[in-house]
Amino acid sequence: MDDRAHGPAGISQPLSPDLLQRLNAWWRAANYLSVAQLYLLDNPLLRQKLTLDHIKPRLLGHWGTTPGLNFIYVHLNRIIKERDLDILFIAGPGHGAPGLIANSWLEKTYSEVYPAVSQDIEGMTRLCRQFSFPVGIPSHAAPETPGSIHEGGELGYSLSHAFGAVFDNPDLIAACVIGDGEAETGPLATSWHANKFLDAARDGAVLPILHLNGYKIANPTVLGRIPSDELENLLQGYGYAPLFVEGDDPDIMHRHMAEALNVAFAGIAKIQRAARVEGHIERPRWPMLVLRSPKGWTGPKTVDGLKTEGFWRAHQVPFTIADKPEHLSLLESWLKSYRPEELFEESGALKPEIASLAPSGERRMSANPQANGGNLPRPLQIPDFTLHAVDVDYPGARTAEATFVMGQFLRDIMRANETNKNFRVFGPDETASNRLQALYDVTDKTWNAAFIAEDEHLDPTGRVMEILSEHTCQGWLEGYLLTGRHGLMSCYEAFIHIVDSMVNQHAKWLKTARGVPWRRPIASLNYLLTSHVWRQDHNGFSHQDPGFIDHIANKKSDIARVYLPPDANCLLYITDHCLRSWNRINVIVAGKQPEPQWLDMEEAISHCRAGLGIWSFASNDQDSEPDVVLACAGDVPTLETLAAADFLHTHLPEVKVRVVNIVDLFALEPQTRHPHGWSDKDFDTLFTKDKPVIFAYHGYPSLIHRLIYKRTNHSNFHVHGYQEEGSTTTPFDMVVRNRLDRFHLVGDVVDHLPKLGAKAAYVKQWLRDKFAEHERYIVAHGEDLPEIRHWRWPE
């Protein structure tokens, strides 16, 4: 491989021979410890002849990307010390965790947070033994890894996390290593455009480092195989000024890397000075690095006669030993090639002259407080949500757009935190569509690309972030939260599935971080899902899917929350509650269309705190046991349930009806399964032990059955919900198609009340006639029957 560096010209100072020697020594030490973690149970410094007893029985982990990460890390340490920089290290290829852990131990951070992994031979032994080992630590840059906010297991999110971390963090620079395999993912490909949303005056900076080692697990990488000029043009087209460092000779590569970083950080400083001192507002061309080095650099060049270094065979553990004991000598030679006797003291600690390369205190990347919930995270200032209460003289008296009311509350939160600058709202081009446009009274949408005269609400300093990529929005928000700030993401309900696997990763991070004593809590990941399944009659079947709730319901009960507020006042309370919470994933599903408002603010607060409860105004069983319970969860199911109750009160007044509304979905679960769950005694009191429960639910009915399957009366629950029936049609036809409408609910009541006798036949006939009338009317008029459109709860 040719050794060369090229890119924009800049200031560069050559490395002194002493500094070059110490940089290379640190790199060798990090590489040595990385290999030792992959292979060794004991004898970490080869003080004894290496035997099979010293080798782990199962070799788990990844070598290929690790030496490149170690190379980058030590050079960033040099620049941190020289310029006193605040740098957050993000490893897109998080499977290179042996390197991150090795550097953390060399910087002594690891021993500070895990005192048993001490700075001596005993600590080094524990460091090696624990890696990818039962009751040890994972193989990726998981929450157990000091300095990490990005596990890098599922690839694609490193760059969006990096930008999220530096928003409103003017002194922070995120050095983000992007693997060339990761660069092939959709989320990463989009996140290059995040530079159009960065304000050099207010935000920090991101230094993307594209690590081209040429191979994935078993294939070449696209960016590793296209011509260099094509790659350079691509990166310039994204708006970056790429600097290339390419080769495999360590001495030459150290010099080129130092030169490139000098140029890059001088460029960042120049851009920030121009924006912050001179007031330049044009979007700059930020520097970035392209490091082309061999996969498995410094490892065995061949194994069993097959090319390994610089090839995909170096991706994981380059060779096994248990089935090929002759490889033991190969491992010993490999480890000794780093000359550990020159690197470590007799005690096992790193030699002082090499250790002096590490920054001190919080300047160490492994000890950066930004990677642990942020530097002195500030609580969100939340004004009184009751100031936005919708006046409700009696149930259904007022009509309001719930999310529009929520938007006014979010506007006041944004205003209250203008000084702290620690709150942002994210969404994929849907903020106004989701009725949150009141935010634009106090801020605009972040935008740092070109402007035209007709543009509205675009500004480099805006705090509403919109890009048509759910992945990028969530990556930004996660990076923002993980560094100590607060936020909310709004999205069309059907399309939040795009980030299904992404929220999996965040849930796993939160679950694991709870068990790491030194990890600080972070603000919750809050979703507003609107433009939901029951009001996507205009966009059709492709926009109709409530299944994200089911996805979240699979997560740990101490993390996952799902709220289905039936009206605006309940939504205000739930929004306030979620924004005050920590270490949660909160999903709020609410409508944006004009809908009846049911509860005044005092009633809404009481109802939401309980999670579920009887709506007395809609019930007539106060003096006796109910004949039937009508349960509902979700705004449209609530509307249809109340219309069904109205029908029963009017036409079948002898039927005793209890109406129960559910806001907190997991209140349905037993207390033994979820902290918000109701006790069996209270649940039975509410839903009865033996009466039919006709349940109108926002999503897929099977979830309700799953949540309540251990309840006494489970077999009497008859759940109506989304049945995967949809089209471009009328709002009421959507619920009819899925048997969630008031008439199907009434029919189900009749079917489960034998006491109605012959009267049931006449009611069922009336219902059949009504369905036929409904179909004729919508086909003829293109809208719902007047009695549907104009129905109101009786005063």
UniProtKB/Swiss-Prot annotation:
The record's annotation in NCBIfam families points to: PRK05261.1-1, PRK05261.1-2, PRK05261.1-4, PRK05261.1-6
Q: Which family would the database say this protein is a member of?
A: Belongs to the XFP family.
Q: Look up keyword Membrane and say if it applies.
A: no
GO molecular-function term, one example from the UniProt record: aldehyde-lyase activity
* Cofactors, names only: thiamine diphosphate
Which example biological process does GO assign this protein? carbohydrate metabolic process
The record's section on HAMAP family has:
Phosphoketolase
User: Which EC class heads this enzyme's classification?
Assistant: lyase
Which PROSITE patterns does this UniProt record tie to the protein? PHOSPHOKETOLASE_1, PHOSPHOKETOLASE_2
Keywords, comma-separated and alphabetical: Lyase, Thiamine pyrophosphate
Documented EC number(s): 4.1.2.-
PANTHER family this protein is in?
A: PHOSPHOKETOLASE-RELATED (PTHR31273:SF0)
Q: What is this protein called?
A: Probable phosphoketolase
